[in-house]
Amino acid sequence: MKTLLLTLVVVTIVCLDFGHTLICYNYWTPLDKTTECCGNGVTTCFAKSWNDHRGRRTDRGCGCPNVKPGIHLNCCKTDRCNG
């Protein structure tokens, strides 16, 4: 619990600026919830998912990338909306 709190404090300090910086999840598994501060001008977070030989895979991050057919993409515009 202390580690989670410390992580949130560090992310908050890093993301503090005089404008608004979007915060998006960038973790690969539900057990590893990490975030990133998006660059200036980035206004969306994404979550894309697909199936491969290892099962269901999900990738998250800043922006809204183009994806190939067969990949499900969800883009959103609020902090941590891609969880």
UniProtKB/Swiss-Prot annotation:
GO terms for molecular function: acetylcholine receptor inhibitor activity; ion channel regulator activity; toxin activity. Binds to muscle nicotinic acetylcholine receptor (nAChR) and inhibit acetylcholine from binding to the receptor, thereby impairing neuromuscular transmission. It comes from Micrurus altirostris (Uruguayan coral snake). Belongs to the three-finger toxin family. Short-chain subfamily. Type I alpha-neurotoxin sub-subfamily. Expressed by the venom gland. GO terms for cellular component: extracellular region. Its main location: secreted. It is found in: Secreted. The keyword Glycoprotein does not apply. It comes from the Eukaryota. Keywords: Acetylcholine receptor inhibiting toxin, Disulfide bond, Ion channel impairing toxin, Neurotoxin, Postsynaptic neurotoxin, Secreted, Signal, Toxin. Disulfide bonds join C24-C45, C38-C62, C64-C75, C76-C81. InterPro entries: Snake_3FTx (IPR003571), Snake_toxin-like_sf (IPR045860), Snake_toxin_con_site (IPR018354), Toxin_cobra-type (IPR054131). This is Three finger toxin MALT0054C. Residues 1-21 form the signal peptide.
